[in-house]
Amino acid sequence: MSDRILFLSNGSICYDSTTYFINCIGEELKAMGWEVMHIRLDKATQKDKLCVLADEYDSQPFDYVFDINTKLDAVCDDSGRYCFDRLGKAVWHYILDHPFYHHDSLNVPLKNMNVICLDRNHKKFIEETYPHINKCIVLPLAAKQAEGGLKPYDMRDNDLIFTASYTDPDMVYFKAKKQDSENVDFFNTFTQRLFDNPELTQEEAIRQMYPGISGVQTAEKLQENFMADVYIQAAIRQEIVVQLIRNHVPVKLYGHNWDTFLMKAEVLMKEDLPFIKEFVKDCGEVMYGELPNIYNNARLSINQLPWFKAGIHDRTPLALMN
């Protein structure tokens, strides 16, 4: 009998990227002879549906449960039992961010929880912080080549693309400043430490600030102050495009909210206004499944790693494949 896997998802995030990844992984498993099921759970009714699955677990035709970036691990029935434990199946939880973003899920003491992550440092942090997790492996996300094959390099329309959402770091900073004084002090110290020492991981910076802190306390500290991490990523993303403009490198921007950046740049970078209007193009949001064709029509792409120090971001194989 072939292996059988159930994919669970609850909602569409990041340009429907998680659904795209699940579909791609499912296609590969089917090609290997696996039986694949995919259930999409509405967040309002996910508890009820998981409980139904748990009630009928003996008759459920699957061996593994797989999800990407969900918080389903923590869903309990009315008696307080975790639905995933009641299923009696091995659970594989694929996380695409730093583990602290998933602390509430990873901290759930499921009987057979397994984790896939993208970075070797993330794996080490998970193994040290959540000893109840049965297994943790590092497996980067692969990529698809554009349909129809590779477009000849000299026939591509775009010289440079950048695919990412824009978040105004100034707005994140102002929001962070409205917190209590302790969190503001943490925000300032933590962000500056990482900017000054970009080789550090988030957890290494925390351990320097709080010697002797435990893994769980580190995750809780980072989770409580997640805006500090958001600010760092937003500031780097903005600086990438600012430097492209200052050096007059044409670029096409794909993603949410770049129109906000361009309005800001037109005010603060008036000396570059003619260049911005002609050579910096906001192409708007696109679904993740459109990216292979977009990359296949560009000669170069820029990728911003989300502070991974020992891992690969999905946009890198996407560029390499196209």
What residue spans do the PLM features occupy?
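Nucleotide-sugar donor-binding catalytic core of glycosyltransferases
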Residues: 2, 9-21, 129-313, 321
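Alpha-helix boundary/capping detector
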Residues: 110, 117, 270, 317-321
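Residue-level detector of short, conserved catalytic/binding motifs and their immediate flanks
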Residues: 89, 113, 158, 249, ...
